[in-house]
Amino acid sequence: LVQNRAWGDLGDWLGLEDEKNDKSLLWEAYFIYDLELMNKIATILGKQMDAERFSKLYAERKTFFNKTYIRPNDGKTIFSSFLPKKRGTSIDIQTSYVLPLAFNIINDEQKEKAIKNLLETITRENTTDCGKLCPSYSLMTGFIGTAWIGKALSDNGYSDIAYRLLQQTSYPSWLYSVEQGATTIWERLNSYTHLDGFGGNNRMNSFNHYSFGAVGSWMYNYSLGIQRDEAFPGFKHFILKPAIDLAGKMKYAKGY
């Protein structure tokens, strides 16, 4: 795992707390996720030696991750030796929990604590890297964390929190953009506002950008409840298991 210094390491791009994160946690989590996928691929292709190698490396990196990034007593995410001055201090932001929970990396002994910590980062007020205070149930994740936050919540029994995030209208949230007139997914949640127009940092600003739209995967898999069965590729067998909005605000979901 090598930091791409030419690009300055984009990390959880446009996450409002990205500067509080240990970017190496993101690299390591995705490396472990990739190893799991490679093990499955090698197994399907009948490459047993490769499958065993990936499986062994997966177990080793998972152990490393838990020892390096998860504090044993409270399950909080912590900085690694990649940032020596911060080593062992809390990260404790949404994305730092979302990836290891969505990828099922955290050991069983710490998992419930980590889930509790993720919920705390969502239900509390948070401060952006620029010092702006955001209300509870704000989407503080960037391009990486946003793709997985719904899965991390729903897979651990908290679809109600995922729905609450989805239905939030204050900044930062998906519907904030809609309230400002969005008919597409924007690169930034506040690319345009009624108050400031196109003010602010518009040097890099797409008005048709997928990344925050990754929530669509959660809507398909959990709100609609249509999920694939890995044992039967191509949806030869699939799972229908919609997650109900217990607050009753989303009364139906339609799709295929």
Residue ranges and their predicted role:
Residues 30-48, 96-109, 148-157, 220-226:
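Well-ordered alpha-helical scaffold segments within catalytic/enzyme domains
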Residues 1-27, 45-98, 109, 168, ...:
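Active-site acid/base region of carbohydrate-active enzymes
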Residues 26, 30-33, 37-40, 53, ...:
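Extracytoplasmic/secreted proteins, especially bacterial periplasmic and envelope-associated proteins
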Residues 1, 56-76, 107-132, 158-177:
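Long, well-ordered core segments of solenoidal/helical folds
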Residues 22-33, 91-95, 140-144, 210-214:
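Aromatic- and histidine-enriched alpha-helix N-cap/loop-to-helix transition segments
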Residues 9-26, 72-88, 99-103, 116-139, ...:
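Active-site-adjacent structural elements in folded domains
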Residues 160-256:
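Non-catalytic C-terminal accessory modules of carbohydrate-active enzymes
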